């Protein structure tokens, strides 16, 4: 619970400040809202007497709530990174495919920072955060979500128009 009391306001603050400078699309902003909602649900919804949604077993062995949250969340982070990078490019110019790859790398860097933060918290407070295997699976699903969105962005890239540029 303490993890949420610290992390949620920090993440909201980061998104608000970034949005002020970048001007994220409504889709990305709603993606952040949905990501935080499913993240909170995973940590707060009880499943039986000694589990929460995050660590409850699933019908599909490798697919758990936490991993789906990581895949979808870092897909959103990739889209946000894409929009941040595009905000620095000249209006009317096509966006190189490599920018989608760079956006995925930015999202994966964020995922690594979050895993470091989770590790540091476990040094001081008992949490439901798993051990090294959980961290590894989190990073794998971060990669899957970031890669899926990066591939979609690379395939559907459009030139940045002057209206989108003026929001920054």
Where are these regions (language model features)?
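Membrane-interface loop-to-helix entry segments
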Residues: 2-5, 61-83, 136-144
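Cytoplasmic-side transmembrane-helix entry/capping segments in multi-pass membrane proteins
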Residues: 2-6, 23-37
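Central hydrophobic cores of alpha-helical transmembrane segments in multi-pass inner-membrane proteins
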Residues: 6-16
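Alpha-helical transmembrane segments of multi-pass membrane proteins
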Residues: 15, 32-42, 78-82, 106-118, ...
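Membrane-interface helix-boundary motifs at transmembrane edges
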Residues: 15-30, 89-97
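Interfacial helix-loop-helix junctions of multi-pass membrane proteins
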Residues: 49-53, 65, 111-147
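Membrane-interfacial alpha-helical segments at the cytosolic side of multi-pass membrane proteins
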Residues: 72-89, 123-127, 143-157
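Membrane-embedded alpha-helical segments that form the functional core of polytopic membrane enzymes
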Residues: 96-110
